[in-house]
Amino acid sequence: MKISLVTDAWLPQVNGVVTTLVELGRELRAAGHQVQVIEPGQFRTRSCPGYAGIDLAIAPAKGLADKLDAFQPDAIHLATEGPLGWAGRRYCLRRGLAFTTAFHTKFPEIVNAAIRVPLRLGYAVMRHFHAPSSGVMVPTPSVLEMLRWRGFRNLREWTHGVDTELFAFRETAGDYPGLEEAARPIALFVGRVSYEKNIEAFLRVDLPGTKVVCGVGPVEAQLKERHPHVRWIGLLPRATLAQLYAAADVFVFPSRADTFGLVMAEAMACGTPVAAYPVDGPLTVLARRREEDGSSDARLGGAMHEDLQTACFAALAVPRHEARQRSLDFSWTQAASLFASFLVPAHGRGAPGSSPAVVTQMS
């Protein structure tokens, strides 16, 4: 099948959405699909206000149309709600083409945290964007229910994966250059240093040992000034990041706005247990859904609590092999197969529920 993936999030950006889409493309190609990626690097761009390192395409409509016309995809997926996503939406609607979309990021929460735009308005814009979609892919059951409550339709639960070979298991926390003499336990955060990540909740927690932050972002300078005793690592290549994960005793995920939180699965793959709030992402990554035998919601690979300090101390007691075992539940091969089953034929606007069978015939 020829699949066009339209995304505003792509390399060299460093975030969970980019990692998800890169891994998705790799798995789809390995399964025999032809994948066209339309991303900002193919257009004139400008930096996203307040988010250095994230470039947005300028007036991409014609260039995007030319690329789609030349490729003639069997299925079109709009991965993000940025300029390219909106241009792809217009392209499809004007030509009567079916398409799918994804809800990777809680943009309403991000703009609310940054500039106080009301959540109601933010979700109205998102609902309008996704309304014509034949299938809106969401990463967790709780996000699906939240969007359904907010009036979104055609929702599809789609999970993510983790590269368990790159992020290899360590039975005991290892050393990382510059942290060999750091006091234990080492508590680690990895991610964009921005408003919505709620990093200060982690930095304010009273914990023994050493706190480490890996990432860059718009609030980095002010957090460094307020928390001079924290170790700030900056951006790392993924192979080096795996070494840092493995060196930590606990991975702290303070965000309340992430839809999934891929970094949690990566940390657990290295054997590092996770501490988090019991909110959307962690509830899926750290807890298995109720089984028929009643063994539901077991905390696997970490701990959740509304008191982040309590979660941290509980996570430190989780054996590293349990964290690794939970990470093995997240497979990129399985995620790509599920993604392909949700795609719809671009030239056939049948009921979304019938699309998986059609896609199978086209594969």
Spans of features found by a protein language model:
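Conserved donor-binding/catalytic core segment of Leloir-type glycosyltransferases
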Residues: 175-208, 212
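Short alpha-helical donor nucleotide-sugar binding micro-motif in glycosyltransferases
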Residues: 68, 130, 243-248, 339
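Nucleotide-sugar donor phosphate/pyrophosphate-binding loop at the beta->alpha transition
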Residues: 98-100, 109-128
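Nucleotide-activated donor-binding/catalytic signature segment of Leloir-type glycosyltransferases, i.e.
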Residues: 220-239
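Short hydrophobic beta-strand element within catalytic cores of glycosyltransferases
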Residues: 273-278, 283, 287
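Donor nucleotide-sugar binding/catalytic pocket of nucleotide-sugar-dependent glycosyltransferases
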Residues: 124-178, 182
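A charged, aromatic-enriched C-terminal amphipathic alpha-helix characteristic of glycosyltransferases
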Residues: 174, 316-348, 352
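Aromatic "clamp/platform" in nucleotide-sugar-dependent glycosyltransferases that forms part
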Residues: 256
